[in-house]
Amino acid sequence: MAFLKKSLFLVLFLGIVSLSICEEEKREGEEEEKQEEENEELSEEELRERRALLDKLKSLGKVVGKVALGVAQHYLNPQQ
């Protein structure tokens, strides 16, 4: 009978230990997934910021080009 008690306690102990290890791994997995989602959100925000910056630079380039064209035409055609 004592042998069965010891065996039963050993099985229960090992089951509890393995269960706690599984729970810990599950929590770590959830934390990693959450962190990956945050990284994806950050990268999406960075992409939006870069697109906005490129749009501003594009607009600025158009304005500078028009000004340069106007100055060049003014100096090439000084009749006015």
From Swiss-Prot:
List the expressing tissues: Expressed by the skin glands.
Entry-linked InterPro entries: Frog_antimicrobial_propeptide, FSAP
Task: Report any one BP term from Gene Ontology.
Answer: defense response to bacterium
Q: Which residues form the propeptide?
A: 23-49
Q: Does the keyword Lipid metabolism apply?
A: no
Where is this protein chiefly located? secreted
Top-level taxonomic group: Eukaryota
Q: Where in the cell is it found?
A: Secreted
Q: Give the signal sequence positions.
A: 1-22
- List the Pfam families: FSAP_sig_propep (PF03032)
UniProt keyword annotations, A-Z: Amphibian defense peptide, Antibiotic, Antimicrobial, Cleavage on pair of basic residues, Secreted, Signal
Renumbered to this chain, the Acidic residues biased-composition regions fall at 30-44
Which portions of the sequence form the region Disordered? 27-46
Q: Which is one Gene Ontology cellular component term of this protein? A: extracellular region
The residue ranges crossing the membrane are none
Assigned protein family: Belongs to the frog skin active peptide (FSAP) family. Dermaseptin subfamily.
What is this protein for, i.e. what is its function?
Answer: Has antibacterial activity.
Name it.
Raniseptin-7
Q: What is the lineage of its organism?
A: Eukaryota, Metazoa, Chordata, Craniata, Vertebrata
